[in-house]
């Protein structure tokens, strides 16, 4: 697919496995990667929506496939990696985007089950998908990008579990960056601010309410758009960032600058 105003070639020849890519930021990353020439595998529990994303990408000239995946389960993570390699011949890029919010309550009101679910999906999910991808990424000298959050840097009341998992992701990426630098694998995190997604709309009631309440907390005065995060993910997966590993790319509208 030749470069156009909507399509580029920054990721031409790349094969990307993206978790949590049926909706929100993950979907935007999958679509932007495909627009930049990557072959994309969507790994998500929501198979129906995943297939609609695949159809959309293919209808726009891209290459995509999907697999049902619970990232908190080792066998699912392993199968997702195998599926990507079988479908497209190799694996060069992993993006860990699957995540869950926890109930907004202080720790003494948070159930152990909700705490464990946050750990299992947000943190263990990225560990597992990375673990099984790394043997293939050693061959391709590829990249891993874990989607963290501005909440890895600053905290919000009632969100201790979410903040803890996202902060841990940043440290996980730094550790892996050191472990695999000699193998040519680059590992970074990307930390969004408040982004206008369906998940955020559900949390606030609707996007207008989210924008009214949370938008002003960002110095730029608004929520970000999913594609603004996706463009950052393209940068981290591309040859534009070849001297970048163990870093956290903040795209947060200035949220952490207050």
Residue ranges and their predicted role:
Residues 1-8, 12, 101-104, 154, ...:
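Short C-terminal tail/terminal secondary-structure segment
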Residues 105-107, 111-119, 210, 214:
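Substrate-binding pocket helix/loop in short-chain dehydrogenase/reductase
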Residues 3, 182, 194-218, 228:
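A glycine/serine/threonine-rich, flexible loop-to-helix segment
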Residues 88, 127-130, 136, 222-251, ...:
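C-terminal substrate-recognition "lid" of short-chain dehydrogenase/reductases
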Residues 135, 178-182, 242:
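Alpha-helical segment proximal to the catalytic Tyr-Lys
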Residues 149:
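Residue(s) in the substrate-gating loop at a strand-loop-helix junction
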Residues 130, 165, 173:
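Active-site helix of classical SDR
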């Amino acid at each position: 697919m030749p470069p156009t105003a909507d399509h580029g070639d920054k990721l031409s020849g790349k094969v990307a496995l993206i978790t949590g890519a049926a909706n929100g930021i993950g979907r935007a990353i999958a679509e932007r990667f495909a627009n930049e020439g990557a072959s994309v595998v969507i790994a998500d529990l929501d198979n129906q929506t995943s297939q609609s994303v695949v159809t959309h990408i293919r209808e726009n000239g891209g290459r995509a496939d999907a697999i049902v995946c619970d990232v908190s389960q080792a066998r699912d993570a392993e199968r997702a990696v195998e599926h990507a390699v079988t479908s497209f011949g190799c694996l060069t890029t992993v993006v860990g985007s699957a995540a869950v919010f926890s109930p907004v309550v202080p720790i003494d009101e948070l159930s152990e089950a909700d705490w464990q679910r946050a750990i299992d999906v947000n943190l263990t999910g990225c560990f597992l998908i990375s673990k099984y991808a790394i043997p293939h990424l050693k061959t391709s000298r590829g990249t891993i990008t874990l989607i963290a959050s501005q909440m890895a840097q600053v905290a919000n009341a009632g969100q201790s579990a979410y903040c803890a998992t996202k902060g841990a992701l940043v440290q996980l990426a730094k550790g892996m960056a050191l472990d695999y630098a000699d193998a040519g694998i680059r590992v970074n995190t990307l930390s969004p601010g408040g982004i206008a997604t369906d998940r955020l709309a559900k949390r606030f009631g609707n996007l207008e309410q989210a924008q009214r309440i949370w938008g002003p907390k960002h110095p730029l005065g608004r929520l970000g758009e999913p594609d603004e995060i996706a463009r950052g993910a393209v940068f981290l997966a591309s040859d534009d960032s070849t001297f970048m590993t163990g870093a956290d790319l903040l795209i947060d509208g200035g949220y952490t600058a207050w």
